[in-house]
Regions:
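Condensing-enzyme catalytic core mediating Claisen C-C bond formation in acyl metabolism
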Residues: 1-28, 217-284, 288, 295, ...
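Glycine-rich loop/linker segments at domain edges
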Residues: 10, 16-19, 103-159, 213
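N-terminal extracellular/periplasmic Venus flytrap/periplasmic-binding protein-like
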Residues: 10-13, 26-35, 43, 165-260, ...
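Conserved beta-ketoacyl condensing-enzyme motif
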Residues: 23-113, 118-135, 190-206, 280-281, ...
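Conserved catalytic cysteine-centered active-site region
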Residues: 27, 58-111, 143-150, 214-242, ...
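Short, well-ordered amphipathic alpha-helical segments that serve as non-catalytic structural scaffolds
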Residues: 29-45, 69-70, 98, 148-155, ...
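Active-site-proximal alpha-helical scaffold in enzymes
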Residues: 88-119, 156-185, 249-256, 321, ...
Length: 386
C-alpha cells in the first residue's frame, strides 16, 4: 500500500488579531497562505508542475477567505493553473482535516503531490461574522453548548480543574514557547513575513506575537473570568488561547513519488481519526479521536514520544490530559496555542508543523497531533518519523 509522507512543513509567525496592534492588521490571510506555499516549494525544490492539488483548511469562508480561497492561494503563490485547490472546513480541525483527507487520497491512488495546510485571519473575518445558527439546533443541544467558553467552564467544574491549575498550565505554555524561541527551535518552521509593529512601522515578523516572556502567575491570577461572574468562573483571557491570524503548509505525496523526485520525507501518516462528542463537552473530542487513531495505527499512548494537543483552553487541554492519562512532559514541548496562538483553520497545520520539527530535532519515532472542535468533535493524526 502506498504511504502518504510529509516532505517539509512551514508556517508564518502567528499574529495577534488586533486592529491597532496586530502585526498582520494590513496583511490578507490569502497572502499569508501564499507566502508559506511559495516558501514550501522553494525550500523543497519540488517541481510546481507536479503539484496536483492544494487543500487548505479555513473556518470563515467569506470576504478575503471566500470563493474557494485554496484555489486563489495556489494562483497567488505562482503555481501552475493545473494545480487544483479545495477549501476544507471542520472548524478548528480544518487544516488537520485537510492533511488527513489528502493522505487518504494518496493512499487510495488519487491525487498524489499535494500542498496541505490552513489559513485564518480572525481580525479581518471574525469567527462569529454573519453567523446564523438554525434555531432548531437548540432542540438537540443548549445554546451554551455552542459557546466555547462555557464548555470550557463546564469541563473545569465537572473535571475538578481549578483556576490555579489552569493558570499554571498557561504559564508553562508561555515559558516553553519563550524557551523554544530563545533556543532557536522554531527557526526550521517559521517563514518570516513583513507586517507592522504597534507604531505602524514596517517590520519583518519572525516570532509569534502573543508569546509573553514576562508572563507570571501573579499576572494571570489578576485577570477576571471571561465568561462567567467572578467567584463562579475560572476561564480567563490568560488561560485561554487568543484570537489570531496566520497560515501554515506542508508538502505531501506518496513515498514512491518522493523517491522518484529525490525528495527526503521527514514523516509518514500512520493513522487518522475523527469522532463526535456531545457539544457540551466539545473539549473532550481529542480523547476518543486519539484512542481511535492509536488503534488504527496499532500503537498505544506509551509508544508516542511527542504530542501536540491544541490548547483552545487550559481547562480543555488539562481535561484531555487527565482523561487519557498522558505524561504531560510529552505535551506541547515548545508551548501551545495559549502562548503561540490559535488561528482556527490554520491551527491543525501549525501544530503538525511544530510537532514534525520537534520529532526531527529530538529523534522521536511517533508523534500525535490532536484537537477539539466546536459543536462537539475531535480529530487526531499519528505521524511516524522517517
Amino acid at each position: 500500500m502506498t504511504e502518504a509522507v510529509i516532505v517539509d512543513a512551514v508556517r508564518t509567525p502567528i499574529g495577534r488579531s488586533h486592529k491597532d496592534k496586530g502585526v498582520y492588521r494590513d496583511v490578507r490571510s490569502d497572502d499569508l497562505a501564499a507566502i508559506v506555499v511559495k516558501a514550501l516549494v522553494e525550500r523543497t525544490g519540488v517541481d510546481p508542475e507536479r503539484i496536483e492539488d492544494v487543500v487548505l483548511g479555513n473556518t470563515q469562508q467569506q470576504g478575503e477567505q471566500g470563493f474557494n480561497v485554496a484555489r486563489n492561494v495556489a494562483l497567488l503563490a505562482g503555481l501552475p493553473a493545473t494545480a487544483a485547490g479545495a477549501t476544507v472546513n471542520r472548524l478548528c480541525g480544518s487544516s488537520l482535516q485537510a492533511l488527513a483527507q489528502a493522505a487518504h487520497s494518496v493512499v487510495a491512488g488519487g491525487e498524489d503531490v499535494q500542498i496541505v495546510g490552513g489559513l485564518e485571519h480572525m481580525l479581518h473575518i471574525p469567527m462569529d461574522q454573519d453567523l446564523d445558527i438554525n434555531p432548531k439546533l437548540f432542540q438537540q443541544t443548549s445554546k451554551a453548548a455552542l459557546h466555547m467558553g462555557y464548555t470550557a467552564e463546564f469541563l473545569a467544574q465537572t473535571q475538578g480543574i481549578s483556576r490555579e491549575d489552569q493558570d499554571l498550565f498557561a504559564l508553562r505554555s508561555h515559558q516553553k514557547a519563550t524557551a523554544a524561541f530563545a533556543a532557536g527551535e522554531f527557526r526550521g518552521e517559521i517563514v518570516p513575513v513583513w507586517g507592522r509593529d504597534e507604531t505602524g512601522r514596517r517590520v519583518l515578523v519572525e516570532v509569534d506575537q502573543c508569546v509573553r516572556p514576562d508572563c507570571s502567575l501573579e499576572g494571570l491570577a489578576a485577570l477576571k473570568p471571561a465568561f462567567m461572574p467572578p467567584g463562579l468562573g475560572t476561564v480567563t483571557a490568560g488561560n485561554s488561547s487568543p484570537l489570531n491570524d496566520g497560515a501554515a503548509a506542508l508538502l505531501m505525496m506518496g513515498r514512491e513519488t518522493a523517491d522518484e523526485l529525490g525528495l527526503k520525507p521527514i514523516a509518514k501518516i500512520r493513522a487518522t481519526a475523527v469522532c463526535g462528542v456531545d457539544p457540551a463537552v466539545m473539549g473532550t473530542g481529542p480523547v476518543p479521536a486519539t484512542k481511535k487513531a492509536l488503534k488504527r495505527a496499532g500503537l498505544t499512548l506509551a509508544d508516542i514520544g511527542l504530542i501536540e494537543l491544541n490548547e483552545a483552553f487550559a481547562a480543555q487541554a488539562l481535561a484531555c490530559i487527565r482523561m487519557l492519562q498522558i505524561d504531560e512532559s510529552k505535551v506541547n514541548v515548545r508551548g501551545g496555542a495559549i502562548a503561540i496562538g490559535h488561528p482556527l483553520g490554520a491551527s491543525g497545520a501549525r501544530i503538525s508543523c511544530t510537532l514534525l520539527h520537534a520529532m526531527q530535532d529530538r529523534d522521536v519515532q511517533f508523534g500525535l497531533a490532536t484537537m477539539c472542535i466546536g459543536i462537539g468533535q475531535g480529530i487526531a493524526v499519528v505521524f511516524e518519523r522517517i
